[in-house]
Amino acid sequence: MTALSESALMVRAALEERGLETPMTSKVVSREEKKEKIEYHMREILELLSLDLTDDSLMETPHRIAKMYVDEVFSGLDYANFPKITVIENKMKCDEMVRVKGITLTSTCEHHLVTIDGKATVAYIPRGKIIGLSKINRIVRFFAQRPQVQERMTQQILVALQTLLESDDVAVTIDATHYCVKARGVMDATSETTTTALGGIFKRIPATRAEFFHGIR
């Protein structure tokens, strides 16, 4: 088992304390064993759907899906994949809002295992620490790469950054298209879902909150 970084342990503990962690069991299974079992069961599913897995187009599909689940679209379930985080002392005494907008994300609806496609905007007010800008994108991606509900994902990103920055002054908003709405059920191809999580000064001070939302337009 890969040892978890201090950042990963801190973030996981903070989410568990707040009841915001993705529902998971404590069962420990190696990556290779996961792939083997997923491939086996995916083969059974596809055969039950009367697909011919001897066809050269489908032959490797169970293997591809297993690899995709473990190494890519659900890799955020494993905190060994939590990004390496660089947080540095705020020697420049920056005290104005830092906002990263248009962060693309692709996640998976945990109810139907179909795509959530969206963009996030994340902001914080620097206090004692600042974070490398690309790390914000990587944190968003980490929490997107697991079965999700958008409301929880928004809160997870907020708490992760609050924990790493040791400051409540963080804001997150996500606009996303849910393919469980677009491609099935109601079949609404144009609707989007917006979720927001605000902390500290963003929640307390209307002017700061307004500045955050104004910058998204």
From Swiss-Prot:
Xref: Pfam families: GTP_cyclohydroI
PANTHER family noted in UniProt: GTP CYCLOHYDROLASE 1, GTP CYCLOHYDROLASE I
Family annotation (NCBIfam families): folE, PRK09347.1-1, PRK09347.1-3
EC category: hydrolase
MF-aspect GO terms: GTP binding; GTP cyclohydrolase I activity; zinc ion binding
Gene: folE
SUPFAM superfamilies membership: Tetrahydrobiopterin biosynthesis enzymes-like
Protein name per its UniProtKB record: GTP cyclohydrolase 1
Any one of the GO BP annotations: one-carbon metabolic process
Catalytic activity: GTP + H2O = 7,8-dihydroneopterin 3'-triphosphate + formate + H(+)
Family: Belongs to the GTP cyclohydrolase I family.
Keywords tagged on the record: GTP-binding, Hydrolase, Metal-binding, Nucleotide-binding, One-carbon metabolism, Zinc
HAMAP family, alphabetized: FolE
Annotated metabolic or biological route of this protein: Cofactor biosynthesis; 7,8-dihydroneopterin triphosphate biosynthesis; 7,8-dihydroneopterin triphosphate from GTP: step 1/1
Subunit structure: Toroid-shaped homodecamer, composed of two pentamers of five dimers.
InterPro entries: GTP-CH-I_C/QueF, GTP-CH-I_N, GTP_CycHdrlase_I, GTP_CycHdrlase_I_CS, GTP_CycHdrlase_I_dom
Gene Ontology cellular-component terms listed: cytoplasm
E.C. no: 3.5.4.16
The UniProt record lists the keyword Nucleotide-binding: yes
Species name: Photobacterium profundum (strain SS9)
Residues at which Zn(2+) binds: C109, H112, C180
